[in-house]
Amino acid sequence: MKRILIAIVKLYRKYISPMKRVPTCRFTPTCSEYALEALQRYGAIRGSYLAVRRILKCHPFHKGGFDPVP
């Protein structure tokens, strides 16, 4: 399961993200980098939870900034 989720994030980074032309993530590391690290470090369940929680924070009303994987 973990490998499938990592593959999905990598596919997003390779094919979907470049279509946006301008980087839109307000965080460092980017949300996709964060998701990859969380999945690799914590596995499918907890890594997915952390990634989704981070993506939900990525909106215009959040200040963003440096937010590493715990």
Swiss-Prot record:
A Gene Ontology cellular-component term: plasma membrane
InterPro entries assigned to the protein according to its UniProt record, in alphabetical order: Membr_insert_effic_factor_YidD
Coiled coil segments of this chain: none
Membrane topology, from the record: Peripheral membrane protein
Keyword set, alphabetical order: Cell membrane, Membrane
Recorded superkingdom: Bacteria
Keyword match Cell membrane: yes
Localization, UniProt: Cell membrane
Keyword Electron transport recorded: no
Family, similarity comment: Belongs to the UPF0161 family.
NCBIfam families the UniProt entry points to: membrane protein insertion efficiency factor YidD
Function: Could be involved in insertion of integral membrane proteins into the membrane.
Protein name from the UniProt record: Putative membrane protein insertion efficiency factor
